[in-house]
Amino acid sequence: MQVIRLPRVAVGLLAPLVVAGCASSGGSSASGTSSSSAASSSSSAGASSSSPAGCTAKEATQPSAAATKPTLDVDGDGKPDTVWIATQPDADGGVPFGITTAAGGTFGTTIRSASPVARSVLVADVTGKGELIALASDNRQVLLYGISSCSFVPELNAQGQQYAFDLGFTGFGTGVGCVDADGDGTTDLVGLKYEPETNGVGTISRTIVELDGPQARNGATDTVTVTRASEADEAQSVSCGDVTLADDGVSSGP
């Protein structure tokens, strides 16, 4: 998605990355930043600056009927770990999700939303150098988490709310992706917004989301012209580099 490496890269929309719940709180919304706060989460493990390779602490319990899938090595022991999501809501209506490491540890959090559709989660490495994130979707917006020291860390926007990407529900964005949007040689997390045109293929706005610990802020925004048919679809989906929510994530339902 450097120029528009949308295939698997431009999966999100520009607006949602900016802030989760920004719209409802009246916060600023950069080109394509979403502000819906329909979904929220509660973390079951605290964040710390560093942790030894191979997480073994059991900070959460993986439900017996959870949907699972192999994912990245999140604890640095060189072995792939497993992302999971409950297929049934908890007593409060939330949907727990988490990661169980090859070393036997488990950590998780819960996504809460009024959306009637299934929840889904994708784990990704933004830069390919260990900048791990989790993208939790309720098909209306995508909540952004950092993954650090064997815990999910909700990334907060300037208003102190969890950062979220819009998926066309509020009109701020349409997807999430990871591409080198500023041409500096490093992949960026971006919010995407596809704008169809009556007499053309349309354009895609890309807003870089800058991560600094538990803080997420909107960075530069640019607009590119769609050059191939699949780019419009990619700009209306969730992906990061070579992984997509549809193919590599876990879902709480069909």
How does the language model describe each region?
Residues V126-T127, I133-A158:
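Long, charged/polar, surface-exposed segments that mediate recognition or autoinhibition
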Residues G32-L122, P214-P254:
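Extracytoplasmic low-complexity, Pro/Thr/Ser/Ala/Gly-rich segments
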Residues T87-A91, N139-Q141, Y194-N199:
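Short glycine/acidic-enriched loop and turn motifs that connect beta-strands
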Residues V95-T101, V142-Y145, T203-I208:
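Hydrophobic beta-strand positions in blades of beta-propellers and related beta-sheet-rich domains
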Residues G21-S24, D77-P80, W84, Y145:
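Primarily hydrophobic membrane-targeting regions of prokaryotic envelope proteins
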Residues A66-V74, P116-L132, F172-D182:
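Beta-propeller blade termini
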Residues Q2-L14, V18, A23-G32, S149-P254:
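Acidic, small-residue rich beta-repeat scaffolds with periodic aromatic anchors
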Residues G76-A86, D125-S137, A181-L192:
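Acidic/hydrophobic-patterned starts of short beta strands in beta-sheet-rich repeat architectures
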